[in-house]
Amino acid sequence: MALVNEHFLKLANNYLFADIAKKVNAYKIAHPKQRVISLGIGDVTQPLCPAVIKAMHKAVDEMAEQASFRGYGPERGYDFLREAIIKNDFLPRGIHLDANEVFVNDGAKSDTGNIQEILRWDNNIGVTDPIYPVYIDSNVMIGRAGVFENGKWSNVTYMPCDESDDFIPQIPDHRVDMIYLCYPNNPTGTVISKEELRKWVNYAIKNESIILYDAAYEAYITDPSIPHSIYEIRGARKVAIEFHSYSKTAGFTGVRCGYTIVPKELKAKTLAGEEVALNPIWDRRQCTKFNGTSYISQRAAEAIYTPEGKKQVKATINYYMENAHFMRAELQKLGLRVYGGENAPYLWVKTPNNTPSWKFFEEMLYGASVVCTPGVGFGPSGEGYIRLTAFGEHEDCKEAMERIAKWLGK
């Protein structure tokens, strides 16, 4: 009989959000007349903007004509989108990229999970705690995480982020090969300054580490002093891979498109000590395992960068951030300690009286019919917190805050 990859058996039986869905469904069955408002899973609610819809319709029409039909596209992505990415997302910030450093994908989740394939299985990893579960789970699958004991993986360096340090992780006192950073942060909604980010780049240069930088929420940054890209830091091209997504930027959760930057200067070593550029390695991996993002999705993404597209996408982002600002203010009125929600669509809320995350989740669900995400699902340091998202309708966010206030007796 064929042997299974036993590393998969180390994973928890349920993905965090699948577990939440089961609990919510059980509640709905028991309370069929009660409308549940979800501020948990971070899916968007607003429709695609008109510029994107127009571009998609045009692309569909092109697929209906033999002269303009498109089959397999280039694995890295079409030039029209990669050039638009460089021109709009990087050049205005003084970052110069070559088109061959841009890899279009079907959403950041794919590449953040798959990028570890091009690095040896015995590299050690460092993660902020709390953290987006995919970063660790994808490393568990390859055998890099070790053994799960007392809520932690034995071969993972956890870098706790809490209120005492504004949720900014401390630089490790030992060498870490692969470092996962996400800013604006999911789940805490906090950001990192250029000064703090520079410390990480310098650490990576000194220790020959690689930073895997998830910038999926950079479009929500409003503070001009906060970096949108790690490549705003001198030297980062030598040590960092950056991931971007259109899911929350432009509502592409159902369209699927994003991109990854792999600089040509970025290198890793063989066991013999030979330096090897990772850009062609990732390109080779993509050519083998990925047939490219759909033409229709890439035309949709290109439309985001038109004058009309920029204006419309910004309006949607502002819609969600209005929710975030409102929710933050209302929760603070209730005496809760709230973080995030200023440069990110996530709010990280301290539970009253240090109530365990899952217990508070259950109490809020049954007491207010409002769904949150238990902070402990993002790591040990998330215990005693919940995450709320601002991706709902204005009316739902308002009603959810009213329900929570009534439930808490405020």
Where are these regions (language model features)?
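A short helix->loop->beta-strand "cap" motif at the edges of active sites that frequently abuts
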Residues: N123, K206-I210, R237-K238
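Conserved glycine-rich beta-strand-loop-beta hairpin in the small C-terminal domain of fold type I
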Residues: Q298, E302, I317-R328, V338-K350, ...
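PLP-dependent enzyme catalytic core of the Aspartate aminotransferase-like
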Residues: K87, L91, I95, N354, ...
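Conserved core of the PLP fold type I
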Residues: E65-A204, E218-I233
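Helix C-cap/helix->beta junction micro-motif
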Residues: H31, K206-N207, L334, A368
